[in-house]
UniProtKB/Swiss-Prot annotation:
This is Guanine nucleotide-binding protein alpha-5 subunit. One of its GO terms (molecular function) is G protein-coupled receptor binding. Residues 32-385 form the G-alpha domain. GO terms for biological process: adenylate cyclase-modulating G protein-coupled receptor signaling pathway. Residues 294-301 are annotated as: G4 motif. Residues 195-204 are annotated as: G3 motif.
Amino acid sequence: MGLVTCKQEREAELQNRQIDTQIRIENQANKRKIKMLLLGVTDSGKSTIVKQMRVNYLDGFNETEVVNAIFVIRNNIIDAFKNICNIILHSDITVTQEEKVLVKLFAYESGKIELMQEVDELNVINAVSGYECIKQFFERFAFHPMVPDHIHYFYPNLDRIASSNYVPTAEDLIHMRQTTLGVHEISFDYTKHIIRLIDVGGQKTERRKWIHFFEGVTAVMFVCSLASFNQTTEEEPKAFVWESSLNKVQNKVLVRSAGKAKVEKPGLINRLDESVDLFKSIRENSFLKMSNFMLFLNKKDLLTKKLTKVVFSDYFPDYKKWITNDNSDVSVAEFIENMFREGLEPEKRMYAHLTQATVTANIEGTFALCCDVIFGKNYEDTNLE
Protein backbone atom coordinates (compact mmCIF):
# COMPACT_ATOMS: atom_id res chain seq x y z
CA MET A 1 0.00 0.00 0.00
CA GLY A 2 2.83 2.35 0.88
CA LEU A 3 4.58 1.71 -2.42
CA VAL A 4 1.41 2.49 -4.35
CA THR A 5 0.96 5.73 -2.43
CA CYS A 6 4.56 6.80 -3.12
CA LYS A 7 4.14 6.02 -6.81
CA GLN A 8 0.95 8.07 -6.96
CA GLU A 9 2.65 10.96 -5.16
CA ARG A 10 5.61 10.86 -7.59
CA GLU A 11 3.24 10.83 -10.57
CA ALA A 12 1.26 13.73 -9.11
CA GLU A 13 4.47 15.68 -8.46
CA LEU A 14 5.68 15.01 -12.00
CA GLN A 15 2.33 16.13 -13.39
CA ASN A 16 2.48 19.33 -11.31
CA ARG A 17 5.98 20.05 -12.60
CA GLN A 18 4.80 19.55 -16.17
CA ILE A 19 1.88 21.90 -15.59
CA ASP A 20 4.19 24.49 -14.00
CA THR A 21 6.59 24.20 -16.94
CA GLN A 22 3.76 24.64 -19.43
CA ILE A 23 2.48 27.69 -17.53
CA ARG A 24 5.98 29.23 -17.56
CA ILE A 25 6.28 28.59 -21.30
CA GLU A 26 2.88 30.18 -21.94
CA ASN A 27 3.68 33.14 -19.70
CA GLN A 28 6.98 33.65 -21.51
CA ALA A 29 5.20 33.49 -24.86
CA ASN A 30 2.68 36.06 -23.66
CA LYS A 31 5.50 38.32 -22.48
CA ARG A 32 7.07 38.25 -25.90
CA LYS A 33 3.92 39.35 -27.74
CA ILE A 34 3.60 43.13 -27.92
CA LYS A 35 0.47 44.65 -29.45
CA MET A 36 1.00 48.18 -30.77
CA LEU A 37 -1.68 50.40 -32.23
CA LEU A 38 -0.75 53.11 -34.75
CA LEU A 39 -3.29 55.95 -34.71
CA GLY A 40 -3.62 59.49 -36.06
CA VAL A 41 -5.63 61.67 -38.43
CA THR A 42 -5.37 61.30 -42.18
CA ASP A 43 -2.06 62.23 -43.83
CA SER A 44 -0.16 62.28 -40.53
CA GLY A 45 2.41 59.75 -41.72
CA LYS A 46 1.15 56.57 -40.04
CA SER A 47 1.38 54.38 -43.10
CA THR A 48 4.85 55.74 -43.87
CA ILE A 49 5.99 54.44 -40.48
CA VAL A 50 4.54 51.01 -41.29
CA LYS A 51 6.50 51.02 -44.56
CA GLN A 52 9.68 51.81 -42.63
CA MET A 53 9.02 48.88 -40.30
CA ARG A 54 8.71 46.62 -43.33
CA VAL A 55 12.01 47.94 -44.71
CA ASN A 56 13.80 47.60 -41.35
CA TYR A 57 12.39 44.33 -40.00
CA LEU A 58 10.72 42.45 -42.87
CA ASP A 59 11.41 41.99 -46.58
CA GLY A 60 10.50 45.48 -47.77
CA PHE A 61 8.37 45.70 -50.91
CA ASN A 62 7.61 42.90 -53.35
CA GLU A 63 7.66 43.13 -57.14
CA THR A 64 3.89 43.56 -57.47
CA GLU A 65 3.91 46.48 -55.04
CA VAL A 66 6.73 48.15 -56.96
CA VAL A 67 4.85 47.84 -60.26
CA ASN A 68 1.60 49.14 -58.74
CA ALA A 69 3.51 52.05 -57.22
CA ILE A 70 4.25 53.41 -60.71
CA PHE A 71 0.58 54.22 -61.20
CA VAL A 72 -0.06 55.38 -57.63
CA ILE A 73 2.91 57.77 -57.66
CA ARG A 74 1.97 59.26 -61.03
CA ASN A 75 -1.60 59.74 -59.79
CA ASN A 76 -0.14 61.43 -56.68
CA ILE A 77 1.63 63.86 -59.01
CA ILE A 78 -1.47 64.48 -61.15
CA ASP A 79 -3.58 65.15 -58.03
CA ALA A 80 -0.93 67.53 -56.70
CA PHE A 81 -0.76 69.43 -59.99
CA LYS A 82 -4.55 69.62 -60.00
CA ASN A 83 -4.43 71.65 -56.77
CA ILE A 84 -1.37 73.60 -57.85
CA CYS A 85 -2.92 74.63 -61.18
CA ASN A 86 -6.16 75.55 -59.43
CA ILE A 87 -4.24 77.80 -57.06
CA ILE A 88 -2.34 79.38 -59.97
CA LEU A 89 -5.57 80.24 -61.80
CA HIS A 90 -6.88 81.97 -58.66
CA SER A 91 -3.66 83.90 -57.97
CA ASP A 92 -1.82 86.76 -59.66
CA ILE A 93 0.76 84.42 -61.23
CA THR A 94 1.06 85.11 -64.95
CA VAL A 95 -0.06 82.23 -67.16
CA THR A 96 0.65 82.51 -70.89
CA GLN A 97 -1.95 81.47 -73.45
CA GLU A 98 0.20 78.48 -74.36
CA GLU A 99 0.44 77.39 -70.71
CA LYS A 100 -3.24 77.98 -69.99
CA VAL A 101 -4.42 74.96 -72.01
CA LEU A 102 -2.63 72.36 -69.85
CA VAL A 103 -2.99 74.35 -66.62
CA LYS A 104 -6.78 74.33 -67.08
CA LEU A 105 -6.70 70.65 -68.03
CA PHE A 106 -4.97 69.77 -64.75
CA ALA A 107 -7.12 72.14 -62.70
CA TYR A 108 -10.54 71.18 -64.02
CA GLU A 109 -10.26 67.89 -65.93
CA SER A 110 -7.44 65.93 -64.31
CA GLY A 111 -9.48 62.74 -64.62
CA LYS A 112 -8.90 62.84 -68.38
CA ILE A 113 -5.13 62.78 -67.82
CA GLU A 114 -5.35 59.63 -65.70
CA LEU A 115 -7.20 57.90 -68.57
CA MET A 116 -4.58 58.80 -71.20
CA GLN A 117 -2.15 56.34 -72.73
CA GLU A 118 1.12 56.30 -70.78
CA VAL A 119 3.10 58.20 -73.43
CA ASP A 120 0.50 61.00 -73.55
CA GLU A 121 0.21 61.15 -69.76
CA LEU A 122 3.99 61.48 -69.39
CA ASN A 123 4.09 64.16 -72.09
CA VAL A 124 1.58 66.42 -70.31
CA ILE A 125 3.24 65.87 -66.90
CA ASN A 126 6.66 66.77 -68.30
CA ALA A 127 5.27 69.73 -70.21
CA VAL A 128 3.39 71.35 -67.34
CA SER A 129 6.22 70.75 -64.84
CA GLY A 130 8.51 72.90 -66.98
CA TYR A 131 6.14 75.88 -67.21
CA GLU A 132 7.30 79.21 -65.81
CA CYS A 133 4.03 79.58 -63.89
CA ILE A 134 4.75 76.30 -62.06
CA LYS A 135 8.24 77.50 -61.15
CA GLN A 136 6.77 80.75 -59.82
CA PHE A 137 4.26 78.77 -57.82
CA PHE A 138 6.95 76.79 -56.00
CA GLU A 139 8.87 79.99 -55.29
CA ARG A 140 5.85 81.73 -53.76
CA PHE A 141 3.22 79.19 -52.73
CA ALA A 142 5.10 75.93 -52.11
CA PHE A 143 3.58 75.56 -48.63
CA HIS A 144 0.04 76.59 -49.42
CA PRO A 145 -2.42 74.54 -47.30
CA MET A 146 -3.73 72.77 -50.41
CA VAL A 147 -0.32 71.53 -51.55
CA PRO A 148 0.20 67.86 -50.58
CA ASP A 149 3.41 67.12 -48.71
CA HIS A 150 4.68 64.41 -51.06
CA ILE A 151 5.04 66.78 -54.02
CA HIS A 152 8.07 68.37 -52.31
CA TYR A 153 9.83 65.04 -52.89
CA PHE A 154 8.32 64.05 -56.25
CA TYR A 155 8.67 67.41 -58.04
CA PRO A 156 12.51 67.48 -57.93
CA ASN A 157 12.48 63.84 -59.12
CA LEU A 158 10.06 64.29 -62.03
CA ASP A 159 12.69 63.71 -64.73
CA ARG A 160 13.16 60.20 -63.37
CA ILE A 161 9.53 59.46 -62.44
CA ALA A 162 7.96 60.78 -65.64
CA SER A 163 10.04 58.55 -67.90
CA SER A 164 8.82 55.47 -69.75
CA ASN A 165 11.38 53.16 -68.08
CA TYR A 166 10.65 54.36 -64.53
CA VAL A 167 11.10 51.80 -61.74
CA PRO A 168 10.18 53.10 -58.26
CA THR A 169 12.82 52.96 -55.54
CA ALA A 170 12.10 52.04 -51.92
CA GLU A 171 12.36 55.74 -51.08
CA ASP A 172 9.73 56.52 -53.74
CA LEU A 173 7.34 54.01 -52.17
CA ILE A 174 7.97 55.47 -48.73
CA HIS A 175 6.99 58.96 -49.98
CA MET A 176 4.02 57.64 -51.95
CA ARG A 177 0.61 58.68 -50.66
CA GLN A 178 -2.02 55.94 -50.55
CA THR A 179 -5.05 56.29 -48.31
CA THR A 180 -5.30 53.56 -45.67
CA LEU A 181 -8.72 51.94 -45.78
CA GLY A 182 -9.60 49.23 -43.29
CA VAL A 183 -7.01 47.59 -41.08
CA HIS A 184 -3.42 46.75 -41.98
CA GLU A 185 -1.37 44.57 -39.65
CA ILE A 186 2.22 43.39 -39.73
CA SER A 187 4.12 41.17 -37.29
CA PHE A 188 7.87 41.01 -36.91
CA ASP A 189 10.56 39.90 -34.47
CA TYR A 190 12.33 42.59 -32.51
CA THR A 191 15.04 41.51 -30.03
CA LYS A 192 13.26 38.87 -27.92
CA HIS A 193 9.77 40.08 -28.73
CA ILE A 194 7.13 39.62 -31.39
CA ILE A 195 5.70 42.97 -32.42
CA ARG A 196 2.14 43.06 -33.71
CA LEU A 197 1.71 46.50 -35.30
CA ILE A 198 -1.82 47.51 -36.33
CA ASP A 199 -2.47 50.49 -38.62
CA VAL A 200 -6.09 51.62 -38.93
CA GLY A 201 -7.32 54.20 -41.44
CA GLY A 202 -7.25 57.78 -40.15
CA GLN A 203 -10.33 59.06 -41.99
CA LYS A 204 -13.32 59.92 -39.85
CA THR A 205 -15.34 57.11 -41.44
CA GLU A 206 -12.64 54.62 -40.38
CA ARG A 207 -12.33 55.68 -36.73
CA ARG A 208 -15.39 53.83 -35.50
CA LYS A 209 -13.42 50.63 -36.22
CA TRP A 210 -10.62 51.59 -33.82
CA ILE A 211 -12.47 50.53 -30.67
CA HIS A 212 -12.37 46.89 -31.79
CA PHE A 213 -8.58 46.89 -31.44
CA PHE A 214 -8.19 48.70 -28.09
CA GLU A 215 -8.24 45.62 -25.86
CA GLY A 216 -4.85 44.23 -24.87
CA VAL A 217 -2.86 47.09 -26.37
CA THR A 218 0.61 47.46 -24.87
CA ALA A 219 1.35 50.76 -26.58
CA VAL A 220 -0.37 53.40 -28.69
CA MET A 221 1.82 55.26 -31.16
CA PHE A 222 -0.11 58.40 -32.07
CA VAL A 223 1.21 60.25 -35.12
CA CYS A 224 0.66 63.98 -35.68
CA SER A 225 1.95 66.05 -38.59
CA LEU A 226 3.74 69.16 -37.28
CA ALA A 227 3.22 70.70 -40.72
CA SER A 228 -0.58 70.39 -40.50
CA PHE A 229 -1.07 73.64 -38.59
CA ASN A 230 -2.30 75.54 -41.67
CA GLN A 231 -4.31 72.69 -43.19
CA THR A 232 -7.93 71.61 -42.88
CA THR A 233 -9.32 68.10 -42.70
CA GLU A 234 -9.19 66.25 -45.98
CA GLU A 235 -12.71 64.87 -45.75
CA GLU A 236 -14.33 68.31 -45.46
CA PRO A 237 -15.29 70.49 -48.47
CA LYS A 238 -12.64 72.93 -49.67
CA ALA A 239 -13.03 76.33 -51.30
CA PHE A 240 -10.48 77.48 -53.87
CA VAL A 241 -10.44 81.17 -53.00
CA TRP A 242 -7.02 82.69 -52.35
CA GLU A 243 -5.24 86.01 -52.40
CA SER A 244 -1.73 86.33 -53.78
CA SER A 245 0.11 86.33 -50.44
CA LEU A 246 0.22 83.55 -47.88
CA ASN A 247 1.15 86.03 -45.17
CA LYS A 248 -2.24 87.73 -45.03
CA VAL A 249 -4.68 86.42 -42.46
CA GLN A 250 -7.57 86.94 -44.89
CA ASN A 251 -5.89 84.42 -47.20
CA LYS A 252 -6.26 81.67 -44.63
CA VAL A 253 -8.81 78.97 -45.21
CA LEU A 254 -9.14 79.00 -41.44
CA VAL A 255 -9.42 82.10 -39.25
CA ARG A 256 -8.76 81.71 -35.53
CA SER A 257 -9.89 83.86 -32.65
CA ALA A 258 -8.80 83.67 -29.01
CA GLY A 259 -7.28 80.25 -29.59
CA LYS A 260 -10.55 78.77 -30.80
CA ALA A 261 -11.26 77.76 -34.36
CA LYS A 262 -13.59 80.09 -36.21
CA VAL A 263 -14.07 79.02 -39.79
CA GLU A 264 -15.05 81.03 -42.84
CA LYS A 265 -17.15 78.16 -44.17
CA PRO A 266 -19.10 75.61 -42.08
CA GLY A 267 -17.41 72.25 -41.67
CA LEU A 268 -13.78 73.33 -42.02
CA ILE A 269 -11.63 72.05 -39.15
CA ASN A 270 -7.97 72.81 -38.57
CA ARG A 271 -6.10 69.52 -38.89
CA LEU A 272 -3.76 70.15 -35.95
CA ASP A 273 -6.73 70.98 -33.71
CA GLU A 274 -8.42 67.81 -34.89
CA SER A 275 -5.32 65.77 -34.10
CA VAL A 276 -5.04 67.15 -30.56
CA ASP A 277 -8.74 66.58 -29.84
CA LEU A 278 -8.57 63.04 -31.21
CA PHE A 279 -5.50 62.21 -29.12
CA LYS A 280 -7.15 63.40 -25.91
CA SER A 281 -10.33 61.44 -26.59
CA ILE A 282 -8.29 58.27 -27.19
CA ARG A 283 -6.19 58.93 -24.09
CA GLU A 284 -9.34 58.90 -21.96
CA ASN A 285 -10.56 55.54 -23.28
CA SER A 286 -10.86 53.04 -20.42
CA PHE A 287 -9.53 50.16 -22.55
CA LEU A 288 -6.23 52.03 -22.93
CA LYS A 289 -5.84 52.99 -19.27
CA MET A 290 -2.73 50.83 -18.81
CA SER A 291 -1.25 51.38 -22.28
CA ASN A 292 1.91 53.34 -22.98
CA PHE A 293 1.36 56.42 -25.15
CA MET A 294 4.00 57.46 -27.65
CA LEU A 295 3.47 60.75 -29.48
CA PHE A 296 5.23 61.00 -32.83
CA LEU A 297 5.47 64.68 -33.80
CA ASN A 298 6.08 63.91 -37.43
CA LYS A 299 7.22 65.80 -40.56
CA LYS A 300 9.69 67.95 -38.64
CA ASP A 301 11.55 68.61 -41.91
CA LEU A 302 8.44 70.08 -43.55
CA LEU A 303 7.73 72.18 -40.46
CA THR A 304 11.20 73.74 -40.72
CA LYS A 305 10.72 74.57 -44.41
CA LYS A 306 7.15 75.78 -44.00
CA LEU A 307 8.03 78.21 -41.21
CA THR A 308 10.33 80.09 -43.62
CA LYS A 309 7.19 81.07 -45.56
CA VAL A 310 4.30 80.82 -43.11
CA VAL A 311 3.83 82.49 -39.71
CA PHE A 312 2.60 79.98 -37.13
CA SER A 313 0.84 82.59 -34.97
CA ASP A 314 -1.39 83.56 -37.93
CA TYR A 315 -3.13 80.25 -37.30
CA PHE A 316 -2.60 79.94 -33.54
CA PRO A 317 -2.71 83.45 -31.97
CA ASP A 318 -2.16 82.00 -28.48
CA TYR A 319 1.40 81.23 -29.57
CA LYS A 320 2.21 84.96 -29.23
CA LYS A 321 1.23 84.78 -25.55
CA TRP A 322 3.55 81.82 -25.10
CA ILE A 323 6.55 83.36 -26.86
CA THR A 324 7.06 86.55 -28.89
CA ASN A 325 8.90 87.16 -32.16
CA ASP A 326 9.93 83.53 -32.55
CA ASN A 327 8.80 81.54 -35.57
CA SER A 328 11.51 78.89 -35.16
CA ASP A 329 10.81 75.20 -35.62
CA VAL A 330 12.13 74.39 -32.14
CA SER A 331 9.72 76.75 -30.35
CA VAL A 332 6.75 75.85 -32.54
CA ALA A 333 7.33 72.11 -32.02
CA GLU A 334 7.52 72.65 -28.25
CA PHE A 335 4.27 74.64 -28.33
CA ILE A 336 2.53 71.88 -30.29
CA GLU A 337 3.78 69.24 -27.85
CA ASN A 338 2.33 71.31 -25.00
CA MET A 339 -1.02 71.35 -26.82
CA PHE A 340 -1.07 67.56 -26.50
CA ARG A 341 0.07 67.62 -22.87
CA GLU A 342 -2.44 70.25 -21.76
CA GLY A 343 -4.98 68.75 -19.35
CA LEU A 344 -3.16 65.41 -19.23
CA GLU A 345 -3.32 63.87 -15.76
CA PRO A 346 0.15 63.58 -14.14
CA GLU A 347 -0.07 59.81 -13.74
CA LYS A 348 -0.82 59.37 -17.44
CA ARG A 349 2.64 59.52 -18.91
CA MET A 350 3.25 60.41 -22.54
CA TYR A 351 6.53 60.07 -24.40
CA ALA A 352 6.99 62.55 -27.25
CA HIS A 353 9.42 62.18 -30.16
CA LEU A 354 10.23 64.48 -33.07
CA THR A 355 10.19 62.32 -36.19
CA GLN A 356 10.69 62.37 -39.93
CA ALA A 357 8.90 59.24 -41.11
CA THR A 358 10.44 59.36 -44.58
CA VAL A 359 13.95 58.83 -43.14
CA THR A 360 14.58 55.18 -42.32
CA ALA A 361 17.31 55.79 -39.72
CA ASN A 362 15.16 58.31 -37.85
CA ILE A 363 12.25 55.90 -37.45
CA GLU A 364 14.54 53.01 -36.58
CA GLY A 365 16.13 55.04 -33.77
CA THR A 366 12.82 56.40 -32.50
CA PHE A 367 11.26 52.95 -32.49
CA ALA A 368 14.19 51.61 -30.46
CA LEU A 369 13.67 54.35 -27.85
CA CYS A 370 9.96 53.55 -27.68
CA CYS A 371 10.65 49.84 -27.24
CA ASP A 372 13.02 50.51 -24.33
CA VAL A 373 10.09 52.10 -22.50
CA ILE A 374 7.45 49.63 -23.70
CA PHE A 375 9.38 46.47 -22.83
CA GLY A 376 10.34 47.74 -19.40
CA LYS A 377 6.74 48.63 -18.60
CA ASN A 378 5.47 45.32 -19.98
CA TYR A 379 7.77 43.28 -17.73
CA GLU A 380 7.01 45.52 -14.76
CA ASP A 381 3.27 44.88 -15.15
CA THR A 382 3.85 41.14 -15.56
CA ASN A 383 5.95 40.95 -12.40
CA LEU A 384 3.30 42.80 -10.41
CA GLU A 385 0.81 40.10 -11.37
